């Protein structure tokens, strides 16, 4: 099952993922799938282009593959709180958040965006950790150059993770 905004779902359709496996959300949904439940949390994209990033575009239904990188618009940012076997894992889609949406969450594990754009957000790391009650396990993610070939020397940016960890 793929859960996401309209853009995510339309990209999946372009690549022939069956509609029965697609769930379109906006944020705020909380679904029970039996052994696992997933809460969809509204979020924000990180500030790009000297804090002037705003993109309201979506990938429209009917898009066909292969999609070019210029067609892969943001389409909206979400976080997902996955609950499984008494544990909670929070995964962030970008380097930003809406504080009031997460301040009562207490995930065991959080996957946090760690690219340099998080430095444009006021006290990103301290505010995030306080809001989440200082999770025991914090895994930096999104420290990649998605335009570089997977496995290449510039695909993974170790210095981004190190800078985030020092905060």
Regions found by a protein language model. Give the residues of each.
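Active-site metal-binding motif and surrounding structural segment of the metallo-beta-lactamase
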Residues: 1-14, 18-24, 105-110
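Active-site glycine- and acidic-residue-rich loops that bind
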Residues: 19-21, 112-123
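Binuclear metal-ion centers of metallo-dependent hydrolases, dominated by the metallo-beta-lactamase
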Residues: 16-30, 126-167
């Amino acid at each position: 099952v793929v859960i996401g905004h309209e853009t995510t779902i339309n990209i999946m359709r372009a690549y022939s993922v069956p509609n029965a496996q697609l769930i379109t959300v906006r944020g705020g949904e909380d679904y029970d799938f039996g052994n696992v439940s997933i809460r969809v949390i509204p979020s924000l994209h990180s500030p790009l282009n000297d804090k002037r990033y705003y993109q309201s575009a979506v990938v429209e239904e009917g898009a066909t593959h292969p999609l070019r990188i210029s067609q892969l618009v943001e389409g909206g940012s979400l976080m997902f709180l996955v609950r499984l076997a008494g544990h909670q894992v929070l995964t962030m889609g970008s380097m930003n958040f809406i504080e009031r949406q997460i301040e009562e969450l207490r995930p065991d594990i959080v996957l946090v965006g760690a690219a340099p754009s998080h430095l444009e957000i006021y006290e990103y790391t301290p505010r995030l950790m306080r809001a989440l009650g200082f999770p025991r396990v914090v895994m930096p993610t999104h420290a990649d150059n998605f335009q570089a070939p997977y496995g290449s020397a510039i695909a993974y940016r170790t210095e981004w993770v190190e800078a985030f960890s020092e905060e």
